[in-house]
Amino acid sequence: MTSIVTYEGSLRTTCVHTAGEQITTDAPLDNHGMGAYFSPTDLVATALASCFLTIIGIYCEEREIPFTFARVEVEKIMASNPRRISDIHLSIDFRGNDWDEKTLTKIIAAGKACPVAITLKDQVNIEYHFK
């Protein structure tokens, strides 16, 4: 088991990981919700950025490459009929890392091969923008 998700009413769920950490989701404002918490589709888009950075962290750790900073701004674009995520744009800031171009290229490739990206690649247009 990975988690337990409980419907709390008012289009809100509570999600509890086996380690005990908890998050709450809410339907977005444009789909009958209050927009007070991440929506389920927000979590999908955010999971992509988190997975991208986690895999880069693993890649760098295994190769003893210093990885001191990264920040990703996530933009999720929805489509309708049926309602779904059509696009995810990641704006990635790696400033402060002392990587040459060859290393950066390999690091980016590792991140783009993360499990969430592989899962989404045939269903969602993913764009990566680097600052």
Regions found by a protein language model. Give the residues of each.
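Alpha-helical metal-binding/catalytic segments enriched in His/Glu/Asp
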Residues: 51-52
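Extended beta-strand/beta-hairpin segments
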Residues: 1-46, 57-131
